[in-house]
Amino acid sequence: MLSGWSVLKGGNMKYWDKALLSLFMCVSTLSIAATHAVAMEGMQMTKEAREIIAHPKGTKESRGVISLQDYIVEEQAMYDWLFKNHPIFTKYGGKTVGKLVVKDRGEEWIEEGRGNDFSKASKRSGGEGFSSMMYRVARNSTLQYPNKFIGPEKCGECHPAQYETWSRSRHATTIRFPGEHPEVNNKLNDPVFDKDTASILPQGITPDVVYCTVGHIRTKFGFFDAWLLRGTYHVEGGLLKNGTGQIVAGGNQWQRTWALNLSPEVAKKIKKWVPDFPVTLEEYGDNGGYVRGLASYAAKYKKSMSFQASTSYCEVCHPWKFDFKNESEFYAALGNAKELQKHTISKGVSCEECHGAGGHLEGGSGLLISNCERCHQRFSYSPDLMRNNPLNAGKPDLALSSKFKSMGPGCGSEGSQTYFTAHYEKGMRCATCHDPHDVTGNVTGEKGIKGVSYNSEQGYLSSLYSKPKLKKECTDCHKEQAYIQSKADTHSKNSCASCHMPFMMSCENFYAIQFQDQAGFDTQRRAHIWKIDVDPARKSLVAGSTSKDPRDGKDWHFERNEEGRNFVDLMWACARTTWADKDQAEAKGCHSPVVSELKETLHFKDQKQVYNEVMGWQTPVKDKFTQVKVGIQGLYSLLEVKKLAPSDKTRVYELIEKAQDTVDLIEKDGSWGMHGFKYTKQRLDAAVEYINEAQRIMKKSL
């Protein structure tokens, strides 16, 4: 071997150098190819999905019906395709700044919300069944071909009124193609507000490689790329369509609150009150990005990103359907945004998502239902609620809470919040109050916001608020409360929802600004709980026992009162900070230390301060209420033993009835002056005088 080497070396040194260089290049090329192959081959679905795929409990073919596990099995082909064909692998060689973390239906539909733990606590299937905590799965997914969808325009032929109201609702536009964004003049790569804030699409992502955006300017915008992969990344130093630059985890989701409302000046104001509140980009940490207003959602900035097909998460509640005849046509179109858009037969929460493919038409699926729970009853199982309440033993359903996004109740959890309220127990459901065809109402767009283009035909698209049209108002049922509130002065312009349905829900999982004890600041949607808990310390939202630090976001859940129901604590009811609540804006910011226009002494920075203020109203009312009740009881006792002239007796009874009317009104109202302090006190003062006059008549007749 050595002699041969020597001969070659001595015989033709120049030739041998070239040979070595060629050999080195071949080895390098093989190494790179091997690296790419490993990157692709190393990608696999989650252990939950793999376990179900490997050990199915029967099959769709054997049962004749599709069940939860079959939805997970059918997604395998989608992930196999993505692992081979997404540009992350074909153009970038699997190299990303930040780790790829696969998320699929197995994890989202089985494990998320502690589904496996709930199954073990359940008696169903001997504790070995499946439990989809977050979703009531749609009957049809985009992976099933052919489907019977005909599209909302076809439904509108026979249901024109319903179509028109639906078409101008946010349900209709939750999914939009590039070119359908009049509120920003379709400039998806330009900063929306100031030049130092984010654009709707992140760096390196151009409209031609985007299938759709998700969301509205009121809250957030995300995107799905042309391969129907969730946009959890951006591209630095190049463009996705060219395969240039580098894929970077996070910095992917446009956030209205951060981009518009949380200016550095506002952030500094909050930081004086909340020392850990972030001001600089660096202080937003994993949740931040490269520019103000573009957060890392389903990602940690430059550390990790979810590799997640549309089929496993967002598409459940932000759906679309294609008219492809078979799977081959579908997979042939993936990667071509225009082709996917051309074959989209419905998008958004359209008619057939609730009423079934084809609706009631001959050949359709025949479903004539409303299916709000599919998207608005996201649960999460809480071991803490099971342990902490003896009444819950053996009843895992009573230990359910809502799906939380870190420390805040997530979007789509309205129904799971309502589930543990007196309203739900009495039979109230979503459609009791809401018209599912007209969920947005007659919303007026913003005309004076820099960067927002007002369009009169689609005004709601440029609106920063949401005021849904309601079939039934609070006052239709709560007449005593409505009557007293109509007499109020201090809170006369407040709606019921202002206090009883505070904006405390997170759409964005913007955990960097979630400070729940201070009732802020990642707050885009109304809570659906209603019951205000008057307590100096008890909190609506609490960390789980597994949390080493409350800010780690582990197992946060709704606390329960003595009746086992959810409640709104005083800080959230009176002093929350949100920029999404039209009612709060019209009420001069209520008592928020950040946005309130009231005098400084009415800016409440902790719950004890709110409680003391409430006691200042309720205590004198309760004292006088007790005085009136005792007085009435005393008069009835005297009437049993004293004889009065008929006219005096009649007058005493009249006075007692007047006092009792006030007692009944105050008792049914239940706010002890909070709905209208002065009027409540005036009624009680009058009731005291009725008692006094009745007592004088009794004494005169002795």
From Swiss-Prot:
Amino-acid positions noted as binding heme c 3 in the UniProt annotation, renumbered to this chain: C351, C354, H355, H437
Catalytically driven reaction(s): [protein]-disulfide + hydrogen sulfide + 2 A + 3 H2O = [protein]-dithiol + sulfite + 2 AH2 + H(+)
Note on how the cofactor is bound: Exposure to oxygen reduces copper binding and leads to the formation of a disulfide bond between the two Cys residues that bind the copper ion. Binds 8 heme c groups covalently per monomer.
Amino acids binding heme c 5: C430, C433, H434, H528
Residues the entry annotates as binding Cu(+): C411, C507
GO molecular function, one term: sulfite reductase activity
First and last residue of the signal peptide: 1-39
Pathway: Sulfur metabolism; sulfite reduction
Binding site for heme c 8: H491, C574, C590, H591
GO biological process: anaerobic respiration; hydrogen sulfide biosynthetic process; protein homotrimerization
Binding sites annotated in the UniProt record for heme c 2: C314, C317, H318
Entry keyword set: Copper, Electron transport, Heme, Iron, Metal-binding, Oxidoreductase, Periplasm, Signal, Sulfate respiration, Transport
UniProt subcellular location: Periplasm
Quaternary data: Homotrimer.
Additional notes on this entry: The eighth heme binding site has an unusual CXXXXXCH motif.
The family this protein is said to belong to: Belongs to the multiheme cytochrome c family.
Name listed for the protein in its UniProt record: Dissimilatory sulfite reductase MccA
Source species of the chain: Wolinella succinogenes (strain ATCC 29543 / DSM 1740 / CCUG 13145 / JCM 31913 / LMG 7466 / NCTC 11488 / FDC 602W)
